């Protein structure tokens, strides 16, 4: 009897071992493919996308044999695939253990062409098993572009909106030279490519969305297209002068704009008219003893929105400066810091400071900040800071400033729509509900960030006029 029991157990073990080692051949085998389409956002010619992936899951206890897995476009396809790390265009007799899976990775590389409009690139992966055929579609948008690697503007140059501009390595504008960027241009900047301005840059956008000029990172695929710190930023060196940005959008940088030292002439080093600076990881504008004139600008969701230190000369009119902590940005710093000094090796270096903020909103939520406006003064240099017609979030009036006028403290501006979970922000004002409506004075600004008219009487605070 003991011998019979041992034989029975052995038979059972062998039976299940054979089942596990056998292949399921039924056309009804339970197989899950985790995607029916792999989509890629805009991919520039001569550059590759990131990999997209899907799994083929064998939900059976027995092994599954894929008779073939092939890239339908073959070797001529713009797509490249690999299966569990092995590259190729066609694979045969792939085995998947019971209740196991394999990974398929796909990447697209766009060949150069002449089209200036985005074009669609399609292919598919065919998976065959047990008489079944399944297709996973591949779909990408290709885009030709001007590619510049370590580009130097050594003579005056103009960029027009014929193709996007992709910056690799760096872009340098030499002293006394001017780069003019006309309406509708799109500038995509690689992760290691700062824009360095020793000379002058003129950005001539227009109010319509299609005619604004955009600066952003060159990763346009999900989820990277929304990441801050995707590229270094735009940096104005001591010799730079007479820079003007009109209807420009600068987003997803590390430091969107950095300025050092006053210009060599009496004009502002940088003028910003109707511009958006958004989602900068460290700072929207960081300025060290420099000069900025800003009108109708939105500086939103940055590590430090405005960081103006070691003096300088600043004027911000009808600007909305706001940050809501979200999954990309920890709101740990005030949206506005103004100081006439900076510590260098624990020694304060100070310069004269003049700053005026008129018809502006300074607001933040969901972070660690109670005072959204911070001021600091060194008594060895001038400190002349004025706030007129302001809505701000503070626990007390900032120190050292001139007596402010027309102040609204700690009342929510009631922006139109804020949804941090969806990463959606509309900083226009709620009609009839915002205390910023009709709270301004006429400082000669006749339109808003949308290009819509402001009244001759009492305008709204911030960059948007409620229509």
Regions found by a protein language model. Give the residues of each.
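C-terminal motif of bacterial Sec signal peptides marking the signal peptidase cleavage site
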Residues: 14-17
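Surface-exposed binding patches on compact interaction domains or structured appendages
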Residues: 19-39, 59-107, 112
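Buried hydrophobic-core signal for structured, non-transmembrane domains
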Residues: 51-58, 121-128, 234, 248
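Terminal connector regions
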Residues: 112-144
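Beta-solenoid repeat scaffold
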Residues: 152-160, 173-186, 192-219
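All-beta strand scaffolds that present successive hydrophobic residues in beta-strands
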Residues: 159, 179-181, 201-206, 210, ...
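Predominantly extracellular beta-rich ligand-binding scaffolds that present long acidic/polar faces
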Residues: 287, 292-428, 455
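C-terminal accessory segments
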Residues: 405-467
């Amino acid at each position: 009897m003991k011998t019979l029991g041992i034989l029975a157990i052995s038979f059972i073990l062998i039976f299940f071992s054979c089942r596990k080692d056998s292949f399921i051949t039924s056309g009804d085998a339970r197989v899950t493919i985790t995607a029916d389409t792999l989509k890629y956002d805009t991919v520039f010619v001569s550059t590759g996308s990131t990999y997209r992936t899907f799994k083929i899951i064998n939900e059976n206890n027995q092994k599954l044999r894929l008779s073939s897995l092939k890239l339908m476009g073959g070797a001529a396809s713009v797509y490249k695939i690999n299966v569990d790390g092995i590259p190729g265009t066609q694979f045969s007799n792939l085995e998947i253990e019971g209740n196991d899976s394999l990974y398929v990775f796909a990447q697209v590389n766009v060949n150069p062409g002449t089209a200036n409009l985005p074009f669609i690139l399609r292919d598919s992966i065919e998976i065959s098993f047990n008489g079944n055929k399944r297709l996973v579609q591949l779909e990408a948008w290709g885009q030709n572009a001007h590619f510049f690697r370590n580009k130097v503007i050594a003579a005056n140059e103009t960029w027009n909106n014929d193709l996007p501009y992709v910056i690799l390595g760096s872009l340098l504008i030499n002293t006394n030279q001017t780069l003019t960027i006309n309406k509708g241009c799109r500038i995509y900047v690689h992760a290691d490519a700062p824009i360095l301005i020793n000379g002058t840059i003129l950005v001539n956008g227009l109010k319509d969305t299609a005619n604004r000029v955009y600066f952003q990172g060159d990763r346009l695929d999900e989820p990277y297209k929304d990441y801050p710190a995707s590229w270094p930023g735009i940096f104005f060196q001591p010799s730079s002068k007479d820079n003007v940005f009109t209807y420009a959008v600068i987003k997803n940088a590390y430091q969107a704009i950095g300025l050092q030292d006053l210009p060599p002439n009496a004009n502002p080093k940088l003028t910003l008219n109707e511009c958006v600076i958004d989602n900068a990881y460290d700072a929207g504008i960081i300025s060290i003893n420099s000069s900025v004139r800003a009108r109708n600008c939105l500086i939103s969701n940055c590590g430090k929105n405005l960081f103006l230190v070691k003096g300088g000369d600043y004027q911000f009119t009808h600007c909305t400066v706001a940050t809501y902590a979200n999954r990309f940005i920890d709101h740990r710093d005030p949206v506005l810091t103004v100081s006439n000094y900076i510590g260098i090796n624990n020694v304060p270096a100070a310069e004269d400071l003049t700053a005026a903020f008129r018809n502006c909103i300074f607001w933040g939520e969901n972070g660690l900040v109670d005072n959204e406006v911070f001021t600091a003064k060194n008594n060895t240099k001038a400190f002349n800071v004025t706030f007129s017609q302001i809505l701000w979030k503070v626990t007390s009036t900032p120190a050292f400033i001139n007596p402010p006028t027309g102040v609204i403290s700690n009342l929510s501006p009631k922006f139109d729509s804020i949804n941090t979970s969806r990463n959606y922000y509309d900083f226009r004002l709620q009609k009839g509900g915002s205390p910023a409506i009709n709270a301004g004075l006429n400082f000669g600004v006749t339109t808003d960030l949308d290009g819509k008219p402001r009244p001759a009487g009492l305008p709204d605070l911030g960059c948007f006029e409620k229509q």
